[in-house]
């Protein structure tokens, strides 16, 4: 008879959790940021609010976003006028859209990741699904498992309503699952659709307008596992450590409330200032054990909550401009897709690194950091190790 210790040892993987594939998807409807203010004020019947429209134009101009993708088309919004009002009961209409479309968008990203991975989907042992868009029972995890035809024995974990830091959270959870279950292959999916947050403008709620200027739709999927099969699976990044912390004195800095009117967002404090003031502490805790203190020696993946956050982090840490290139590229081409953003950035980085012949998946560098920022204020810090290209 085996002992508990022997059994536990046999259960655990030997090597670190490794990202083995990445896939992304967006709705087909692409929105040009330069013309979005005119469209937004027209579709919400707010063209008479000329001063507010000028403010919104400035927000869009400063956003550093060129385009975004949105499931909500003009046709859908015309069929659901309450979604175009500032605060009209509209949760049913919103939910009806997202409970179908969130798993569907997630499926597209997952299929791309599975194709790159090159293994049969029957080898997927765990599924982690994350969204801030829509709640049903059974949830998006169940719907996605059905859409993909995963085994009934797949161990599912559903994460709802976490917000923008959750791209880091899912990596932390998947890391623990992969490393503590020998042979586990974890499918992680973040799928976000702004149908829950879209609403008309109001002079009394400018922070809501900030969200309307920044948020976009997208889904990203990764396959994670330890001890990749040599010659069969191709590692992209290794996950070395993962931590979560609450920023001091930041309660109420970012709030979201799911009510009859949908999901409303409130930005109450200086979020970029709070993040930049506290980010070095997270970096020191993560990298001191590795003997790393030069932040420019790392490759960077930071959740692009908005350009102000990126600018202040750059300034505070003395980062060279190219450090946040992949992050800014994703913000420019997709907007803020909440939890999915950091996975899009990982994808952008490894593709650009290979294309430019930089030697590793992390822009030619060995060590990197991934940050998730969101409600709480919560900061997720993931230490990454790149792989030779």
UniProtKB/Swiss-Prot annotation:
Q: Which reaction does it catalyse?
A: (E)-4-coumaroyl-CoA + 3 malonyl-CoA + 3 H(+) = 2',4,4',6'-tetrahydroxychalcone + 3 CO2 + 4 CoA
Gene Ontology terms: biological process: flavonoid biosynthetic process; polyketide biosynthetic process
Q: Is Transferase among the key words of this record?
A: yes
Indicate the residues that form the catalytic site. 164
List the protein's name: Chalcone synthase 1B
The text of the family note is:
Belongs to the thiolase-like superfamily. Chalcone/stilbene synthases family.
Q: Which Pfam families match?
A: Chal_sti_synt_C, Chal_sti_synt_N
Q: What class of enzyme is it?
A: transferase
Annotated PROSITE patterns? CHALCONE_SYNTH
Briefly state the protein's biological role. Answer: The primary product of this enzyme is 4,2',4',6'-tetrahydroxychalcone (also termed naringenin-chalcone or chalcone) which can under specific conditions spontaneously isomerize into naringenin.
Assigned keywords, A-Z: Acyltransferase, Flavonoid biosynthesis, Transferase
Identify a single GO molecular function assigned to this protein: naringenin-chalcone synthase activity
For this protein, the Enzyme Commission number is 2.3.1.74
So, what pathway does this thing act in?
Answer: Secondary metabolite biosynthesis; flavonoid biosynthesis
Instruction: Tell me if Acyltransferase is a UniProt keyword of this record.
Output: yes
């Amino acid at each position: 008879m085996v002992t508990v210790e022997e059994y536990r040892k046999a259960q655990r993987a030997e090597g670190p959790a490794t990202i083995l594939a990445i896939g992304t998807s967006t709705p087909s409807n692409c929105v040009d940021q330069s013309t979005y203010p005119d469209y937004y004020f027209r579709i919400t019947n707010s063209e008479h609010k000329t001063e507010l429209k000028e403010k919104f134009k400035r927000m869009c101009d400063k956003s550093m976003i060129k385009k975004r993708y949105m499931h909500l088309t003009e046709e859908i919004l015309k069929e659901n006028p309450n979604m175009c009002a500032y605060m009209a009961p509209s949760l049913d209409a919103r939910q009806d859209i997202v409970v179908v479309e969130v798993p569907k968008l997630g499926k597209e990203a997952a299929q791309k990741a599975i194709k790159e991975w090159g293994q049969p989907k029957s080898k997927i042992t765990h599924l982690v699904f994350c969204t801030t868009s829509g709640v049903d029972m059974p949830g998006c995890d169940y719907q996605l498992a059905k859409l993909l035809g995963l085994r009934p024995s797949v161990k599912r974990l559903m994460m709802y309503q976490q917000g923008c830091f959750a791209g880091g959270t899912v990596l932390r959870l998947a890391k623990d699952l992969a490393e503590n279950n020998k042979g586990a292959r974890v499918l992680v999916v973040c799928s976000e659709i702004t149908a829950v947050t879209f609403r008309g403008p109001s002079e009394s709620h400018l922070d809501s307008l900030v969200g309307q200027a920044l948020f976009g739709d997208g889904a990203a999927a990764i396959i994670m596992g330890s001890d990749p099969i040599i010659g069969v699976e191709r590692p992209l990044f290794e996950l070395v450590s993962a931590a979560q912390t609450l920023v001091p004195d930041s309660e109420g800095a970012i709030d979201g409330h799911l009510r009859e009117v949908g999901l409303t967002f409130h930005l109450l404090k200086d979020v970029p200032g709070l993040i930049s003031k506290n980010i070095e502490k997270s970096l020191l805790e993560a990298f001191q054990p590795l003997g790393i203190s030069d932040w420019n020696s790392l490759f960077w993946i930071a959740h692009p909550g908005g350009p102000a956050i990126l600018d202040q982090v750059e300034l505070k840490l003395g980062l060279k401009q190219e450090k946040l290139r992949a992050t800014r590229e994703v913000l420019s081409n997709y907007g803020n897709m909440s939890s999915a953003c950091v996975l899009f950035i990982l994808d952008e980085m490894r593709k650009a690194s290979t294309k430019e012949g930089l030697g590793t998946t992390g822009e030619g560098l060995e060590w990197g950091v991934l940050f998730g920022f969101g409600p709480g204020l919560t900061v997720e810090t993931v230490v990454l190790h790149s792989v030779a290209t």
